[in-house]
Structures are given as structure tokens and as C-alpha cells.
Amino acid sequence: MLAPAAPAKDVVSADEKEEIIAKRKFRMKNVDAMRMSSLANDRMAFNKKCNALAMKFVKSAGIGTDALQLTCFQELVRHFNPIAAVVVGVKREPNSNVQAEKKTIPKVKTIQTPTQSMESVRLLQEKKASATEEQSAESASIMKHFANTIPNSTPTQSVKDVLTAAASKGQFKSSAEIFSHFPSEPSPSKPRATREGSQPSDYTYCTYLTPCILCEKALLMRESIAMTDNEAVKVLMAAVMSGHFRMATAEKAIRHERLRMCYDHVDFVYEMMCDAFEAKTESEINEMPPDRLMRGHDIYRALKRVGDLHKGKVTSNTPLYSFKNSIKSYYRNHVPRMVNGSLSKPSPKPFSELVALLQSVPPSTNLNELLNHNLSLSDADKQELIQLINGKDNRFTSRRRKIEDILDNKFAAAAAKAYRDHSEDAPSEPYIPNQSEMQNTVERRKRKLHSPEQDDAGSSSISWNAKKTKTPIDYVHLATRVLEGHSIADEALLHKSKVSYARNAFGEKPSSPTPPSAPLKFCVVNGKKYLRFENGTGPPKVVVQGNVVLRTNTLKDALTTAPRAQNQPSTSTDSSSSSEMEGIRQSFGAPQKEEEEEELVPTLLQNKPTHVESSSPVEKKPPTKTNVEKPAVRLGRMLTTAFGSMSYRTRKSVENKTDLLNQPTSASPRRMIKVVRNRNPHLAKQVAAAPSEPKHIPPTHMEKKPEELLMDPKPEPIF
């Protein structure tokens, strides 16, 4: 079956379409016009209602109509309704009976009788007065509460209190007598005016004064402790938890511009912290009650939020573990930060107050009459007062040190006795300790010391005067060490030239010292003191002037070329002393014969010889480890004595090789002589003339066997 045909639609012409569109546009225009007119009517009605309500609020509150023009009031109106119109006013002359915030702000045109204006002014004044009374009452109650809870600052003893004791004891008769002991100082400048618009308080706000966050006392910068935000919050939190502060008082204190605290509240803050958390040390924080920790955390976050909002910072919620660590840091840093000398309270200077006090009265006024009361001081305070007035301070007076503190403990007894015997009342003869007063520090046995005798070469002028010499301790010390058996070269270089103890080429310490062959004595030549051997006729060995040992090239040569006492062979005393004097004469350039010069260096080579030929029928003992000296050691000691020390590579080669003379590839005597020939040709000549062992020439690589080449593939380096 076929579906029925759809009905035919009416055909609309183009003219009809245009007419329909025109009607629709006209209808839309009318709707928009009606809507805009209704909105305008609604806004006008809203503005009228706002004005009526605002005037009603002003009249009921007793405030002038000028409050409608305040910016804060207009912002409040826009907050509730953004499309609300601002109250329009007209400029007029300011009324003297109406209080205005600014004279340039336009005033609202209102119709108000004089009675209403006076009433509004009276209500405004009463409101301000009541607010001031409430604030002053609150400040008074807070200060009274502080006086009962917080300990007062430690009172500084004033000038009147300090000087009254001196007056009562009869130290000074009049004020002019005290005035002469103090310098005049200008009077301190007057404090600046208070800041405009500041709230009334018990202290005066100045640009250089800062109130304490606990006692509200005006403080100078040098009288207070600067605190960070976190430190101030912790202090105020402890005050709230311990019951000394209310939360409102702590919030008011945290809003201060500069957070400072008195020096005297440091111990009190620690007591508050201990009372708040029931802990006295950092280790006890982990054991404190949980409720204390949670309560302190809440108060800390609340005060921190108030301080951040007041300073325009982004508020932060401190977690519990950070708060706990901050409390631990306070206990950890309490002693070093609050008790050390860097934060100690500076002592005030009483000069300004004293000068002003004494200038206001005549000079003949009695001190008791000036002060009008008497006070008592202890003996220590009395002495301190007398020192202050007289300008004497004996804290830094230098005291003479004892001789036992300066010298070594080993030789203090002998040197002290020598110093006492050579004082002003003692005879002029030099003192040499006897056998009962000296002990050998190494071998611990007594020796027999020779008493000094006058020398024939002008030793009659021997004198020891303490007035001419400041401290003769150095001379006595040096003489005592030498008499103990130490070498003069070692002592002079050790004490005066800062040269370490003399060692041989291998760095070995010499054996136990033995006493010298002849004792030493002091002599004075041309106003200078000298140390020399008693039986010697040559120049002195050590030159001493005042407290300084004169060290010259000739003196150095004399000290270094003199043979060591412990290295001397077992010969007679006369031969050893003569060899020593020969070395002294040679070093000081004394005129000698050529034969004596030729015998100088071979004498040095005979220190502890292994083979000694003598005509006396003495049995030769076999060499031991203690008395055997290798040729390398002998040559190294001789070169070290003459030129200071060997080079590093030469010393290493000597240490590594058992026999220096049998190793020509490392360092032979001829090569050493060639190196030092320019420095001391005379010594090189003597060393060259000395007998030496025959050289051992090793085979070349061509003569070596294959096994020897494998064992020693590389030749040894030369130096």
C-alpha cells in the first residue's frame, strides 16, 4: 500500500518575511528599553534607600555625617553591593564644631541643627575618653602584674652610693677633692620628642629607645638583646605557659617594631622555659609530657601567625617536629649565647653624673652634706673605689718571673744558685757549681768539676755585676749545660740560632755526653763577656754581649770545627785540649805555622778510629757494634761538620750502601772533593791526602755473565 501524501505547506512571499522581521526587531527594542528603564528606577530607589539608612545609622550612633565620606565606609558599601553608588557630596566650608579627619575631603550636604552637631561632638569625645581610660587601666594592671611576677633589673650602683662610703671613712673632705680626679664631660643631649600619634604608656617612645617585650621598659641598644621573630615568640610562649602573661598581652608584645629584651631577664626566661616544659636540659625534652608539648605548639603557632600578619608576611604553620627542635636549640644555645663575655652588660661611666653633681654645689661643701646619707661598703669595694678615684689599675702590673719558671727543670737548681750568688750583694767572682749540686741528666752520676782560675791573658778584670747585665740567666744556663757535658756548639746553636740538636749524617742522636777536658770561665774584654777554656790562650770560644750570643762566620767555624766530646778517642786530657785549641785558633784566624794547619783536618778524621797503632803494650780489643765506625760514616761526619749537612741524594746513597768508599758509582771521595773544592780548597787538599781503601772496579756489561745481567739489568745512577 502506498503512504498518504503530506499536506502542502503555505507559501510565504518575500514581502511577508520582511514584515515579520521588522515586527520582531521593534518588539526587541521595546523590551530592552523597558528593561533599562526598570533598572534605572531600581538603582535610584536603592540609592535613596542607602542614603536614608546611612543617615539613620549616623544619627543613632552619634557620629557626624562626615563619616559617610570616609574611604573605609565606601569600601564597606561596595563590598556588600558592587553596583551601589557612592554618596555624592558637595564642597563647603568646614564647620568648626564638627570634627573632620581631613579638611580637603568633600563633606556631605546634610541638614543638621546646631543642637544635633554639638551632641554628636560630645558623644565622640566621650567615646575617645572611655577608650583612653580602658587602655591606661589595662596598662596599669599589666605593669602591676609584671612587678609581682618578673624580677626587677639588677640595680646598678649609682655614683652617690659608691662615693658615700669614701666620704664616711674620711677619704675625701670636700666635693672639690673628688672633682679633681674626674675629667669633665659634656652633658648628655636631651631626648627627642615622642612620635606623633603614639598611644599613652608608662615609657616615652624615642627614635633610639626600644621597649622590652617583657617589662615594657625603654631600652637603649647597648642595654638590650636583639631578638629574632622566632626567639621572641618562644619567650612569649614560655611566659604564657608559665602563667606570667595572658594571650592578649603576648599578642600585643609581638607586634612591636623592634623585638628587644633586657639583659637582666635572661635567667628569668630560662626559669620560665623550665617551668613551661618541665625540663632543664636538651636531653629532657624527649621525656616531657605530651600535653605540654601540644599546648606549647598551639600557642607558638598562634603568636607566630599574629606576628606574620602584623609585618605583612605569609603565614606558615610550623609542624610539631620543627617546634620541638626549636625548643631543643634554645636549651642548647642558652649558656654560650647568654652568659659569654660578648653579651655582657657594659658598665656605665659615672663621670657625667658626678660632674653635674659637683658643679651644682660650692667646692667647700662637705661630701656627707652633699650626699645627705651614709652607706657602708665592703673592704673590696673600698679598695676598688680608691683605685677608681686615684686612677690606678694594678691588674696588668708585670711581675718578675722566677728563675725556675724560665730555665729547664734539669738545670734549674744549679742555675738558680748561680743567679742568687751573683746578685748585687754577692762577690764578683763567677760561680761554678760543685760536685754535690750537679747531676748528670743522662748517666745520673756525679762528676768532679774543676774550680776556675784566673787566666794570664787579662782575666783579672773578671766581674759579674747585676746592674750592668739585665738578666745573666742565659750565661749561667749556657755554662751549666757545658759543664754538664754538652757541646758548646750544640747549646749556642740550639738556644740562640734556633738550630736543632746536632746530629750526624744519618740523623742519629749522639751518645751520652762526657765532661770536657777543661772547665770554662767568664772573662770581660772591652766591655764584652766571653766564655773560654781555662787553660786556653787563644781567642774566646763564645762571644756574649747582653742577652745575645754574637754569631759570626768565624764563630760558626769555631763551633762546628771543634771536635765533639763524645767522639774523642781515649787519650790524655792535654792532647784533647790542645787539639781543641788548635781548632779554635784556626777558626778565628790566629797566626799559626803551616805544620799546624796540615795537622788540623787529619785530627778530625781520627774520631773513634777503628785501627790505632801505638807503641804501648795494650791489647787490642775486637771491634764491636758500639765502637766500630765505617769509612762512610767517618767521611760523612767530617763533611757534615765542615759544611753543615750533606745533600739529600748523597745522604740517601749513604744510607742504602754499606760502604761508601767501595761504591764509586754512587758517590766517591774524589767526586765529593771535586764538588766542595771551590768552597774549602784547604779541606779538600787534606781529604785528598788522606789514605783510602783501594777502589773496586766492577766488570762491564760485556764482561758480565748472563746470570749477572739478569740479576742487575740496569746500571746504578750516578747521583
Curated annotation (Swiss-Prot):
Q: Which organism is it from?
A: Caenorhabditis elegans
Task: Reply yes or no: does the keyword Nucleus apply.
Answer: yes
Q: Give me the ranges of the annotated region Disordered.
A: 179-199, 419-464, 559-626, 684-719
Per the record, the GO terms for biological process are: cell differentiation; negative regulation of vulval development; positive regulation of gene expression; protein stabilization; regulation of cell fate specification; sex differentiation; vulval development
Task: Summarize the record's disruption phenotype note.
Answer: Greatly reduced nuclear accumulation of lin-56 protein and increased mRNA levels. No obvious vulval development defects. Double knockout with the synthetic multivulva class B protein lin-15B, dpl-1, efl-1 or lin-35 results in a multiple vulva (Muv) phenotype.
**Compositionally biased spans, kind Polar residues:** 604-617
Q: One cellular component GO annotation, for this chain's record?
A: nucleus
Protein name, UniProt field: Protein lin-15A
- Spans of biased composition, class Low complexity? 570-579
In terms of Pfam families, this protein maps to: Lin-15B (PF25375)
Lineage at the top is: Eukaryota, Metazoa, Ecdysozoa, Nematoda, Chromadorea
